[in-house]
A protein has these predicted regions:
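Cleavable N-terminal export/targeting peptides
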Residues: 1-29
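Transmembrane beta-barrel domains of Gram-negative outer membranes and organellar outer membranes
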Residues: 23-177, 186-240, 245-253, 257-262
């Protein structure tokens, strides 16, 4: 997962796919992005947990490096905590019958750095290396986070052929272990493709996969259908629909972002 909470995983994956669809944006540019993600799922339990995730992201894109800082607001309504959702083990029985509780506050802040390791130019091949640190800033008392830092390293490959871009990601994540839990470090990845309809609009599909975080937990498998549209030289919008296929991800979700190039 890209974050301790599943909603963050959606935004991070979608951003990775949409930012590098063809040639990189102009270097030496700052941008600000915000949006909203809503997803819901039972995570193997009997009652749904709803998640609202509102990130604010600042990004600096240089010639070969991209730096990102994401500060999110998080709201969870339901019986599930972050730990149970990560495991894919939603509450059942008496716990699931309890009145849903809404918890909200600061989510986990994420810092990321991406290096363009190879840009093949006319060949259309691009390879990136990304390092991420998820700071445990979300309240573990409220069940909004684990309270621990997580670390991830991933490689990203893009192949542009005409209007079609295919892409894949392979990463490894090291989890911080909260008190009373032993979370496994996991491999994760994604595969997908995007089609450029015109100079302003592209859309596509991506499949996200990940190992289970605990022995009793569930693996991750979800599909995202996304679209991105440039309004002008400074404004860009993005949106997606999610369908989950395992207990380790939401049953479904929707989201949208808007970015402004400074």
């Amino acid at each position: 997962m890209k974050n301790a909470i599943l909603a963050a995983s959606l935004f991070a994956s979608f951003a990775t796919a949409s930012v590098h669809l063809a040639h990189a944006e102009e270097s030496g540019k700052f941008s600000l992005e915000t949006g909203m993600d809503y997803n819901t799922g039972k995570y193997g339990g009997t009652q749904s947990t709803d998640i609202l995730y509102v990130p604010v992201t600042g990004k600096y894109q240089g010639k070969s490096w991209t730096l990102k800082l994401t500060v999110p607001y998080l709201q969870i309504t339901g019986p599930g905590s972050v730990i149970s959702l990560i495991n894919g083990m939603g509450p059942t029985g008496v716990a699931a019958a309890n009145t849903p509780v809404t918890r909200s506050g600061l989510g986990d802040v994420v810092v990321a750095a991406t290096h363009n390791a190879y840009n093949g130019g006319p060949s259309g091949l691009m390879i990136n290396l990304t390092g991420k640190v998820k700071l445990g800033t979300a309240s573990s008392t409220k069940g909004l986070g684990t309270g621990k830092n997580d670390y991830a390293l991933q490689s990203e490959l893009y192949q542009v052929t005409g209007n079609l871009t295919t892409f894949g990601t392979l990463g490894y994540k090291v989890y911080g272990n909260p008190v009373g839990y032993n979370l496994n470090n996991v491999f994760y990845g994604s595969l997908g493709g995007s089609y450029k309809f015109d100079q302003e609009t592209n859309g596509g599909i991506m499949l996200n996969l990940g190992q289970k975080v605990t022995a009793r937990g569930s693996s991750r498998l979800e599909a995202l259908f996304f679209v991105s549209h440039k309004l002008d030289k400074t404004w860009k919008t993005q949106g997606y629909v999610l369908k989950g296929f395992t207990n380790g991800v939401p049953d479904w979700g929707v989201g949208a972002t808007v970015a402004y190039l400074l």
